[in-house]
Structure formats: C-alpha cells, structure tokens
UniProtKB/Swiss-Prot annotation:
Gene this protein is translated from: MUC22
A Pfam short name: Epiglycanin_C
Membrane association type: Single-pass membrane protein
Keywords, comma-separated and alphabetical: Membrane, Repeat, Signal, Transmembrane, Transmembrane helix
Induction: Up-regulated by poly(I:C).
Chief place of localization: membrane
Full protein name: Mucin-22
Tissues showing expression: Expressed in lung by serous cells of the submucosal gland (at protein level). Detected in the placenta, lung and testis.
Region 124 X 10 AA approximate repeats: start-end pairs: 153-1514
Taxonomic source organism: Homo sapiens (Human)
Compartments reported by the entry: Membrane
Chain segments annotated as transmembrane: 1661-1681
Amino acid sequence: MRRGNISPAFWFLWLLLFGLLGPSSENTTAFTKGSDTTTASITGSETTMASTMASTSALTTGSKITTDSTTGSETTSASTMASTAAFTTGSETNTASTTDSGTTIASTRTFTTGSDTTTGSTAGSETIVASTTVSGTTTTFTIASTTVPETTMASSTTSTAGSEKTMASSIISETTMASTTGSETATVSTTGSETTTTSTASSEATKVSTTGSETTTASTAGSETTTTSTSMAGSEATTTSTADSKVITASSMSSETTVAPAAGSNTTTASTTGSETTTILIKASETTTASTAGSETTTPSPTGSQTTIVSISGSEITTTSTAGSENTTVSSAGSGTTTASMAGSETTVSTAGSETTTVSITGTETTMVSAMGSETTTNSTTSSETTVTSTAGSETTTVSTVGSETTTAYTADSETTAASTTGSEMTTVFTAGSETITPSTAGSETTTVSTAGSETTTVSTTGSETTTASTAHSETTAASTMGSETTKVSTAGSETTVSTAGSETTAASTEDSETNTAFTEDSKTTTASTTGFETTAASTTGSEPTMASTMGSETTMASTIGPETTKVSTASSEVTTVFAAGSETIRASTVGSETTTVSTTGSETTTASIMGSETSTDSTTGSETTTASTEGSETTTASTEGSEATTVSTTGSETTTVSITDSETTTTCTEGSEMTAVSTTVFETTTASTEGSEITIASTSDSETTTASTEGSETTTVTTAGSETKTAYTTGSETTTASNTGLETTTVFTIGSDTTTASTEGSETTAVSATGSEMTTVSTEGSENTTVSTTGSETTTVSTTGLETTTTSTEGSEMTTVSTTGAETTTDSTEGSGTTAASTAGSETTTVSTADSENTTASTADSETTSASTTGSETTTASTTSSETTTASTEGSETTTVSTTDSETTMVSTTGSERTITSTEGSETTTVSATGSETTVSTEGSGTTTVSITGSETTKVSTTGSETTTTSTEGSEITTASITGSETTTASTEGSETTTASTEGSETTSASTTGSETTTASTTSSETTMASIMGSETTMASTIGSETTKVSTASSKMTTVFTENSETTIASTTASETTTVSTAGSETIPASTAGSETTTTTSTEGSETTTASTEGSETTTASTESSETTTATTIGSETTTASTEGSETTTTSTEGSETTTASTEGSEITTVSTTGSETTTASTEGSETTTASTEGSELTTVSTTGSETITVSAEGSETTTVTTMGSETTTASTAGSETTTVSTAGSETTTASIEGSETTTVSSTGSETTTVSTTGTETTITSTEGSETTTVTTAGSETTAVYTTGSETTTTSTEGSETTTVSTTGSETTTASTADLETTTVSTSGSGTTTASTAGSETTTVYITGSKTTTASTEGSEATTVSTTSSETTTASTTGSEMTTVFTTVSETTTVSTIGSEATTSSAAGSEATTTSTEGSETTTASTAGSETTTASTAGSETTTASTSGSETNTACTTGSETSTPSSAGSETNTAFIIGSESTIASTASLEPTATSLTGSETTTVSITASGATAASTTVSSTTFVLTKATDVSIQPITNTPMSGTRTTGTRLTASSSVTMAPGMDFTASAASHTVPGIVLNTSGLGTSTMGASSTTSAHGVRTTTGSTREPTSSTFQETGPVSMGTNTVSMSHTPTNVIKPSGYLQPWAIILISLAAVVAAVGLSVGLSFCLRNLFFPLRYCGIYYPHGHSHSLGLDLNLGLGSGTFHSLGNALVHGGELEMGHGGTHGFGYGVGHGLSHIHGDGYGVNHGGHYGHGGGH
C-alpha cells in the first residue's frame, strides 16, 4: 500500500525529476545514438586511434606494443607521434592521434620506457621529428578542421601512413634524428643497429630522413596532405608508406627484383629500391613529394649526402636500392659511418665508410641483401643464388664431394641443380677426386711436387694444400662464399678463413665457385638466368649478386662454368680431364695450360673444383698448384692449413685462388671469344665501375660471361697462357690470371705487368711451369714462399696492400698496386703459385687492401665493380678474379669484387663482409681500426688489410661472418670456425666446408641462406640468418660439419674416401683436398684418414696427407694453432679457447685425443694462459718471429706455451719457428708432448708427427709459414696469427725460416704491426676474449658450441668433438674461430673489434648463442628475435649492438639491423621469411618494426613472424600500422567521419560542435570535454575515459563522451581489444596518462561546447534538488506531507532495504529515458540506499549520493559533481 502510495508520490517525484532531467539527457541519448552509430564508424579507425589510446594504455602496458605490435609500432608511431604529439602533441594530437598520443604519449613514455627507451630515445627524437611532421600535420589538421578536408587529411593520415613512414618518418625523422642521428647514429648506432634498422628504415629513414624532410615534407605533406599531395603522398605514403616500407620491403625486394630485372630500372628500381632508397627514392618520388622531399633532399642533403650515399647507393642504388637501406645502412653505414664513426675507425671504416659505401655496396651487399628483401629476391635469386650459394654450399658439398655432399649439400638442389652441376661439378670436381688420379697426377703432382719434392711435401702439403688450396679456394670464399657468402663463408670463411680451410671450404667454395662453376654451371644454366638473375641477385646482391655475381661471376664462372660446365664437365671431364687432369697433372703442365686455361684456373675452377683435382689440377693446379701453388703456398697454406688460418691468409690468397677460381671464370676464360668479352671485361672494369650498374654489370655479368669471355680473353691470355700456361703458365700470369688479371689488368690489372709480375709470377708461373715441376712451383712455392716472401712483400704488397690501402686508393692502382701487387700479382701470379694466393692472401691483402681498398674498392664496391676493376688487384685476385673481375665485371666487378672479394672475399669480406668488413673491414678497419693498426693495418691494413683481408678475410669472414652475423656466425662462425675447426675438418669439411661451405653451405645454407647470403641479406640478413643459419649453420654446420666433414668427408670422405680411396691417391689430392679438407674435415679422421691419408696419402699424399694431416693438424694445429695460439694467445682465454683451439688444432690433429690434448690443450689452455702470456708472447709472437726467435725462447715460454704447443703445434710451426727454437721444437716437443698430447692427439702426434712433419709440414707449414707468411699477411691478420705466423713465420723460417717468411717476419714486422694489430688482436684477444667471449658466444654458441660443437661436431664431426668439445669448449670451434680468430684474431681483431663490435654482438653472440641454438635459434632466431629482444636489449645491446650496430651498423648496421633486425630480422629472420618480405618489410617492419620492435616489438618481432603475416600486412600492417597510425589518422579521418557521424550527431549541433571542435580528438576528447564539464577535474577527464565503461549519461556533453565512449565501445567492439579493455586501463592506469589527455584536454577546449549542456545539468541539479524540495513541498501540500512522507519515508527505507522494484524500476526508467543507467541507477540506488536514511537526509544524502555518485561515477570517481557542487557529505560520500 504504502509502497503503492509511495510509488505514486515517488513516481511523481521521479517523473518530475525526469522531466527536469530528461530533456537534455534525452537529447544526449539521441545524440549518444547518433554518436554511437558514428562511434561504430569511429570504432574501426577511431578505435584504432582509441585503440591506440587504449593500446597506448596497453602500449604503456607494453603488451600494447605487442598488441599494437604492428599497431604497437603503429602506436609506437602514434606513440612516437604521441611522443611527438607529446612534443608536437598539439598537432599530433590534432590527429585523433593526439587522443592516442595523449594516451599514446603516456604509452609512449611507457612504451619508450621499454627497450624503446633507447630506441624510444631514438624513436623519441624520432618522434620529435615525427612530431615536427605531425606539426605539419597539425597545420594540415587545422585544415583538417574541415571534416572533409580532414578526411582528405585522413588521406594525409594515409599520407601519415606515409607518415607510417612518418612513423617510419618518426623513425625517419629518426633518420632526421638519424641525420641528427648522425650523432643519433651514434645513438642510433647504439640504437644504431636499431636505428640502423631504422637506418635501414633509415634509408627508409634516409628516405625517412628524407622523410624527416619528408616529415617536413610530411609537414609539407601536411600541406601536401592538404594538397592531397598527401593523398598522393598518402598513396605515396601508402605506396611510399606501405608501399614505401612495403615497397621498401616489397619494393626493395620487388624493386630489388626489379633491380635485378632492370639494373637500370634497378636504379629506377633503385628508385623503387630507392623507395628502399626509394623509400628515399619514393621519398624521392616522395621527394617528388620530396619536392617537399626536395627539401627533403635538402633535409636529406645530409641525407642528401645520405641520398648521396644513396646516390652512392646510386650505383649503389641497385646496391643502394637495396643498399638504399644499405645506404641507409650505408647511411647507417653513413651513420654506419657514424656507426662506423662509432666504429670510430669504423668511421675510418667509414672511410671504409666509403667502405661503408663499400659497405653500402657491401651494405648493398648486405643491404642489397638486406634489401635482399630483394634478399628475398636475391634470396629467390639466392634461392638459385642459394642454389648457387647452395652450390657453393653444395659446392662445398660438392667440394665435400660431398659431391654427394653436393647431393647432400644439395639439397642445395636448386643448388642441387647447381649442385647437380655442381654436384657433377663437385663430383666432377670432386671427381677431381679422381682428380685423385690427378692427385695421382698429383702423385705426378707429387712427382711434380716431387719436383716440388719437399714442395711435394709442401706441395703434397701443397698438394693437399692445393686441395687445401682448392679449399683455399676460399676461392669459393673468394666469390663463392664471397658473395657475402664468402663473407659469410668467409665468416665461416675467416672462421672459414680458418675455414679458409673454411676457404678450404671455400675451396669447397672454390668448389663452390667450382660449384659456382658448377653452380654457375647450374646457375650457368641458371647462370645467365641466375647470372642475369644472379645479376639480379647480383643487382640485388649488388655485391651479393657479386656474390651471386660471384656466383654470378660464378655465373661468369658459370659462364666460365658454361665452359666451366664444360669445365665442370671439363671439371667432370675436367675431373676426367682434370681427372685426366691426373694426367692433367701432366696436363697440369697442360693444366699449366690448365692454368692457361686458368682453365687450370679454369680447371682452376676445375682445378678449384679439381682443386681436388686441384691436386690433379694441383698438378694441374700444378699451375693450379701454381694457383694451387698459390694454393701451393696455399698448399703451403695448406700446410699453413694449420696456418690454414694462414691458409685463410692463403685463403686470402686463397681468395686469389678464388681469383683463380675467378680464373675459374678464366675457365670461363675458356670462353675464348669470351675473351673478346674481355675487352668488355676491361670495360667490365668500367662495368665494374659500372658496378653500380653492377646490375648492368650483372648484365655485364651476362657479359660477365663475356667477362668470362674476358676471362675468356683471359683464357686467351690464358690461352696464350695456354701454351702460355706453361709459358703463359708462366702466364701463371695466367695465374697471372693476372693475365686475367692482366685482363683484369685490362681491367686495371693490366697486371699485365702482373703478368709481368706474372712473369714474376711467371717465375711463379715458372715455378708454376715448374708447377708442372710444381715442384718448381713448389720451389716457386718455395719461391712461393719467396712469393710468399713476395707475399711477405705481399705483406709488403700488403704493405703495398697497406699501400694496397693506398693501393686501395691505389687499389685502382691496386690493380696497379695489384700490379704492385703485380708482385702481388706476382704474388698473384704467385697466387698462381698460390703464393699469389698467399700473395693473393697478400694480394688478398692486396685484395684485402683491395678489400681494404675493397673498402675503397668497396667504396669502389660500387666501383666495387670498379673495385672489381680495382679488384683488378682484386683483379689480381680479381686478376684471377680478373675473370673474376670479369666475373667481377659480371659481378659487376662485384664478382670480381667477390672474387676480389674472394680476395674480394676480403673484398667480399670487405664487400660481403666488405660491408661487414667494411664494417668489419670497416670495423675491420674499425676492428682493424680497433686493431687500430688494423685500420692502420688496414692501411697497413691493407697490408694488415691483408690482415684486414685476412682479417677482413677473417674480418671478411668475421666481418662477413660478423658480418655481425658472422659474428653471430662468428659464434656460429666459430661454429663455422669450429666448422672451420672442422674447417680444417671443414677443409675436409671443406667438403663440410661444404658444411662450412655447407655451413658456409648451410653457411651456404647460410650460404644458401648465404645463398640468401647471396641474399647476403641472408648473409646480412641471413647474415644474421647466416648467423642464425650459422647457428643452424652450426647445426647445419654441425650437420654439415658432420655432414661435410663426416658426411661430406665421410660422404665426400667417402667420396673423399672414395676419392679418398683414390683419394689415397686421390686422398692425396682429395685427401689434401678433401682429406686435407676431408682430413681437415674429419681432419682427425681424415687426418686419420689423412693418417691413412698419410698412410695412403702418405705414400702419395703422404706428405700430402701429412700435409693433409698437417693440413689437418696443420690447419688445426700448426698454423692455425699457431696463429690460433696466437689467436689463442691473443684470445688468451681465447687461448683457452685457443687451447680449445689447440684442441681445435689438436682437435684437428688428434683432434680427438687432441681433445685430450685439448685437455692438455686445456693445460694448453693453462699453457695457453701462458699462451695468454703467449699472447704477450704472441705479441712478442708478432715480433714472435723475432720474438719467435725470442719467441723461440719465448716459444720456450711458449714452450710453456709449448704445452701451448698448440701454439707450439702452431707454435710447432711456431715451434718450427721454435723449431728454429729447436727447443721450441722441444717446446714443440712440448708441443710435441703437446704434440705428444697431440701425439696423444696421437694422430695429432701423428699429426703432430705430421705436425712434426707438421713441423716438417710446418716446414711445409714453414711454407705454411710462407703461407703463413702469406698467412703472415694472413698472419697479419693472423697478425697475432701473424706473430703467430711470425712464429709460424719463424716457422716460416722454421720451414725454410727460409721463407721470405723471414721477410714474412718482415711481414711479421708488418705482422709485427700486425702483431700490433695482434696487440690489437691482443685487444683482439680482448676481442679474442670477446672472441673468447665469442667463445663464450660460441659457448653461448655453446649449444653454439654445441653448434660450435655442432660446428664442433663439425669439428666434432670432423674431430673428436671431445677436443671439439674442448673445441666445443667453444673455443674449439671458437678456437677454430679463434684460429679463424687467429686470423680470426685478426678477424677476431677484426672480429675482435668485429667481435667486439660483433662481440657487442656478443649479445649478438647471445644471438650467436641463440645461434648456438641458432639452429634452434633459427627458431631461436625467433629467440634470436628474443635475442633481438635481446637486441631490444640489443637496443641496449644494440647500443652494444650499436657498436654492434657500429659493426652491424656498418655491418649493415645492416647486419646489425640485420643483426638487430637480423636477430631482429631473425625475428625478422623469423621475420626472416618475414625478412624476405620483411627484409624490406621486415626491415621495413624492422624499420617501423624496429620502432615497434624498437620497443618490445622485437618481441613483437617475435610476433613479427606473425608480423610476418602482418609483415606482408606488416608492411601493410606496419604500413598499415603506420597507416594504422595513419589509419589511426585515417581513423581520425574516420573519426572525422565519425565526427561526420558526429555530424549526424551533429544533427545535434552541440555534439557536432564538440565533435568538429574536437575533431579527431572530438570524439574522445569530446568525452574528455564532457569531462571538461567538471572543469579542473582532470580526473573527471580520466573519469570520462572511465565513463566509457559505464556508458555514462553525460548530458549531451557526456553523451558525446558516451558517444565517444560508445564509439570506443563500438570501437572496442571493432577494436575488440582496445577501448573497453584498454578503457579501464586508460582510466585506471592511464589515468595519469589521460590526465595527459586531460592535458590534451585542449580538445577539452573543444569540449566546452559540450560542457555547455553539462553546465545546464548543473543547473538541473540545483533545480532538481530545489525541485525535489519543491516537489516534496508540493506533494506534502497535495498529499499531506507528513503522512505521505512517513509512507514514503518508511517505504524508501524499506526500499533502501529491499526495494528492488524502485531500483529496478528507476533503472528501467533510466533505460527508458535513455539516461545513463548509472545516473539513475545510482539515483535509484541512492534512493534505495538513501532509503535507509531519512527522506530529507536520506533523500538528500541518498539522492546526492546516488546522483552524485552516479554522476560522479559517470565522471569517474569524481565523487561527484555533488562533492564538488553539492553536498560535501553526499558528494564526499
């Protein structure tokens, strides 16, 4: 009853109240609806914005980042924008972004707070830039005021999507920042890699930077937006943005492809890539927008220079195109330079910077690769490229003979195809196994070698060396790995360098190149296609194509291969022929003509392929040996194989060998008419200059074939060389491929003199001719040593190379220098003798110088092609490369570069690593620079550069390996190195090198990846990937390691063994080749085999085997070990590692018991610790030579080191020096005991014995030393190694002591400085420590080790992982790496800084660790992404990575980017595939992504794979994200639409006004504005946000909010994630943030319009209260106040107690009225609640409470308007 009574009165009151309240709320309600509906519209985009806000909250949460991963980045962008907004806020805000930004700001802060902090900082600045951009937008915004225009603006927003770029722009502005970032780069550098990524974005950024201007432009774009230019920009942006980034991704990739398609268009594409650059270019078109961008250009002026860089990229463009980012990288490199600058010397590197430019090129290589997004393209290309690489891989595989390896390797199927060809090539080559026959011939070789007699021993060693030389075919390293592959392989390379055995792998590579040849064969078929395509790849690769080209030239080789194929076939037949090359040996004389052929080179390739036949060819190589001789010294190197690092050096020369491989091209040379092309080749050089046109060159590449033709002419020369061979072979000049080089010379090398040198070489050749007498060659080899001395002079040449650096300048002259190198060439010719290789190693140095100059050349790298021309010296290498140049020509000269890179590897290293090296080389320079003298060395450098080369070789490898990846790879590189360890094994593995190559291969796989390595991006990207792959590489390596080594070896071993059988005979050849390789591979086993090899081989290969064993131990123990020790020494702990390395050696030797030995080595390690002092000693070691003498005693100390024996072993050779020490020998004995340990190594002992013979071999090692001398040069790299080498050199003296090694000592002096470098290397040791750390990394690689082990197992596979385990002690692989590190040390030095830089990568290493798991890491790569995340810390790491970046930065910062991105990419890598798309996209993503990833996004990066999906969308998403941000902006537009809907709401002008006024902000801010309603209450504002959940009924204003809220809600619905979920967050968490929003309240200013009504409400409140009182009075009067009141009173109270009806009813009324249920609900509650209280008090309180609370609630815990406006108590309550 009462209730009923009350109800009437009550209802009356309610009705009255509603009547009072209803209207405005009513309107609101409608409004809300309209708004709501609109909201829905808003929801989509708005939500995004809102979402962004919410996300922002989330973003703050960080999950947002994840959530917004894309959006995040979007948000990040927005966030950045937000930050910008924060900065710019107004303008940014103006876009709905503000709303987001408000939140975003908080988020940004928060977000930034994330890893983004650094990044954020960058991003921040980036943001700031963006902010500026936004400001532009703001202006636009104003324009935007017009809803429609605003919509246009939305287009602008789209433009903003451009701003995606804007986001990127932010990043881009980052670039601007980056420009600022120039310093930023430092920061960026730190962030660098991140930034670099950004840089990548940078080119993007650059573009962005341009975009910075872009931003300006964007501002302009703003106007442009207004202009709709935005629209254009929008599309531009979209295109650019999405397309841009996407284009970048796609474009780069696409354009990359395009690039590939039209080198010219590539330029255009470059434009597209430009969009990569093109982003810039697109920016360029953006620039068109860039007209504004024009200012951009202006802005970019720095960027302009950036652009210039881009321009550099120009030619770069193709390169740049990819390089674009590369440029970016280069820019990054620029900043890279900055980074390089970071690198400091890096900057020097920057000079290397030009290196960077080179890097750009390399970068291009990388970037290309990176861009390889085209990477992908390349990758695709690479795919075939990979195939190529794979081929390289398979090549390795092939090398593995692995032919089956090939089969196994390929798998490398596409490779297989290549592989098949390669396979056959391999097989053929491997068949070169029958080459064994050749080895038989090698036997004759031996016979020849016999003439080589001891040479035979040496030669045998050489022979195997030759095999090694073949291996030395780092040849592969040269181009093959070279792509960056070499770099990478090189990485594995330098690891491989150790890999040099790696190069051995390279040999595999050579095989590779052989394969390449084969591959080319494959690609040959593919070749033109590939070549063309390769060229594309080349284009893409830029250098990559270089690599690819190399592969391309490979193609050229392929062309060569064509004939190569013929050769390959020839190789096959070659095998047969070479095989016949057995007679080939006789043919070797013929091969001499082979040399003439260079066919010898050709067969060289064949020989290289043959390399096994090399042995045969070796006989063939005879000239091959000449080359082989180079290989010979290579062989020496092979002996050096211990030096194998030396070999690496040799590999450097190996590269020369590679050059030879290039000669392989020369084989192409066979192209005869191809010769005519030669002129072209000369032109090619021009083409090389064309390098930019690289693509053109790629075309040229086709002409490359022409080049090959040139090579052909080379052939002609060769042909002349033909008979020349003998005569020409004196043309050894042919080896003087110099003739090629000569041709190359024609290129520049007109080495001609080189030929003359070749004449020298000729003598070399003569030796070569002697090569027939190979023995003579051997003698020459001796002279080879002399040549080595020449190499020493090589060092001198290296000095020249140093000059080389000068030469670098000279490099053109480099060619000339190369001519100087001429001696270089002579050396190069010697390369023919292998001294050339050594010289080449020297020249490699030269090449390195070239590589260094390569840096220059690299700079030249565009000229890289030119370099290739320059490579001329490169050509020397190139010479060999000459055809390489030809290839290089084809390669652009890139191949040349690549070949050169081979030395070119150095180049490539430089180039491939070139970039990296450039970075490394750069850092190499940096590292070298870090090496300081390294840089100096670099200059020396070049001399050292040889080191650099070696270093770069290593560096190259490291660099390449590090490139960062290599570093990572370095880790895995280590693994690879391990593999390299196995490298020795790898040498076998060489087959496994195939593994290594394979690793290289996988390296190749990485290579393949490397192929993608060719993708280089892969390298860079895969580089990371490579690293990852390295990881997996390792795994692969492991697999491969085992695969190649075991498998390969086993298989190839089988094959090898098979060959091994004949290998026995073949084994000699193969053994050394495979055996050496194989032995190197199984080294122990092969060593054992080698042992048997020795036994079997021993007979023939015997010494060969010994050499092989030596090679095995040699590689492992002596040289490597020595330098390794030095490295180890350098490594100090590295030593430990070195010890491990020792075991590595030991491992190699015993390797198993060696492990014991390794254990001993462990004590070795202790000794090594001593070795640590050894390091000192090592330093002394540098003087070590002298010291070595001293070292002798030192060595005695070393003797302690003796246990260092490894050192001793190496030391053994060291001992050899020591041997000079004699006691050292005793020490060696100690080493002997070490050896004994080694003996324990048993086989090691045997090896040791061999090692002894090693000593002998070491003597060979001596020649090894010579090689080492070369290694000396290598040693220079070895520097530590050098000193080690020096020691070895001493060993050189050891051997001959004779060797110019003495001069080697001089070289050593250079080495000394190298030692200084070594000292640097010492720091290298630090680095080595880093390397050690690398070891750690390797340890990290632990699994890496495992991987390393795997690599180890690679070694392990090869050797007893035990030692491997010891080796696994990471160092094993590390040791290997260390060995590599030895040279690696140089590399480590390079790597050191590289490592250091890379090492910074250590986290990278971590990545490497990841890499360790890397295989997993590939997944781990995801973790890599984690690493990337680590990269996030990477960002921190990146800071470190920054240095990494520095390295990476240079490394492509790309690499870093790749690394960062790389790991990022790894994420990207995961993204990798992402990368493929993402490469651009990924990097794009990385770019944008980096921002995103920059923060968490890295995690997101993990998502990035998702992002990958996103990536496509990512790109889109990112773009979208950006556009998402843009979209948000667009959304804003949507908001605008919403606003328009608001307009529907606008029907309710009030809303409309706020909406319009609010604009984007409008909706939300409108909500905020309603908040404004409670002026001064930011919380209220927050509340408003909060309100959203509650669908508050704010009168119209709130309604608007509600609307907004609803919209949000809808948005949420749409957004699902965002708004609502975020809301609370926004409200609660972000509340402060919202306060910022409150700050953003500016919108609130808009809001006030809405406020108006709210004000009305306030009026109503009073009215209501008054009305209530009035009503009460009225009711009382009407009903009888008392009675009714009582009735009401109790009922109310009861209602309060149990009266749900009123509550429900009131609620119902609320709903009916459409009022915020909360309000009445609260009211109802209040009444109910108040019901307990007195009506007056209760009502008041309750009502006040309820309403106040309700409203308050609506507003958020305002506690009310009531509190503020009504009863303190009620409100307060």
